[in-house]
Amino acid sequence: PYQTNCYAVINPETHEGFVVDPGMGAAPQVRELFAQHQARLSAVVLTHGHLDHIRDAAELGVEVFIHPEDAFMLNAGGGLPEHSRLLFDASSMAAPDSITHLRHGESIEFAGYEFAVQHAPGHSPGSVLLIADELVFSGDVIFRGSIGRTDLPFSDQAAMTESLRGPVRDLDDSLAVLPGHGPTTTMRVERATNPFLREANTDRIHGGA
């Protein structure tokens, strides 16, 4: 319903892969994609715990990775407004069979690709950046020209400001940014044009899209 971006990564050498943020309706498409490529899905990786990013995580039947501060949301969309839970039919959600917590500062491998985990709260308590050599999965921390909302339950505008001042600001300009919604961008472009990032050293940060 919210046009969430779901990313699938398949290692062509090992035919193993993972998906990032499988929202509502993603599971059948993910299964079809992996079948077409004769690949094995080994992990679901979540940038945060909002329903539009996690709805089909358990349906894929593999290990689910999420920051511990958002793990409670895997329980039928815990912590979100009732209208969101109804929109995503949260009452019918199954909890994942196996959950691994993403820890700030750790390096973790998915399907042969290394990612650094950077905690970047604000949009949600457990939002993370997943940083590789050439790209970052930014979830709803930063989008092209905007940032994640901070008017939701468990959002925190002050924490978002600090994330923009620290973890986001520190990302290398060369990185491609693969956000949770909207088109891809680069850190170089966002540093030059994103008004929320540019104002991150002031107190005038407001939630964007």
Segments (PLM) and residue ranges:
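Conserved beta-strand hairpin/beta-sheet module of binuclear metal-dependent hydrolase folds
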Residues: 1-37, 129-139
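Residue-level detector of conserved, well-ordered beta-strand and adjacent loop positions
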Residues: 10, 103, 109, 121, ...
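Residue in the alpha/beta-hydrolase core beta-strand immediately N-terminal to the catalytic nucleophile
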Residues: 18, 45, 109, 118-119
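Residue-level detector of beta-strand structural context in well-folded domains
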Residues: 7, 100, 105-106, 128, ...
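Active-site HxH/HxHxD metal-binding segment of metal-dependent hydrolases
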Residues: 24-109, 192-200
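Residue-level marker for buried hydrophobic side chains located in beta-strands
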Residues: 18, 45, 64, 137, ...
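Metallo-beta-lactamase
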Residues: 25, 39, 79-84, 113-209
